């Protein structure tokens, strides 16, 4: 569902943020 897509996007954003730290 839409929430699943949002969750996947959030996970990717957090993953990229973690790499920058």
Curated annotation (Swiss-Prot):
It holds the Pfam family Antimicrobial15. InterPro entries: Antimicrobial15. It is found in: Secreted. Its main location: secreted. The keyword Cell inner membrane does not apply. Has hemolytic activity against human erythrocytes and antibacterial activity against the Gram-negative bacterium E.coli. This is Ocellatin-2. GO terms for cellular component: extracellular region. Expressed by the skin dorsal glands. Belongs to the frog skin active peptide (FSAP) family. Ocellatin subfamily. One of its GO terms (biological process) is symbiont-mediated hemolysis of host erythrocyte. Keywords: Amidation, Amphibian defense peptide, Antibiotic, Antimicrobial, Cytolysis, Hemolysis, Secreted. The modification Isoleucine amide is found at residue 21. It comes from Leptodactylus ocellatus (Argus frog).
């Amino acid at each position: 569902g839409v929430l699943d897509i949002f969750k996947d996007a959030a996970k990717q954003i957090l993953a990229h943020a973690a790499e920058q730290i």
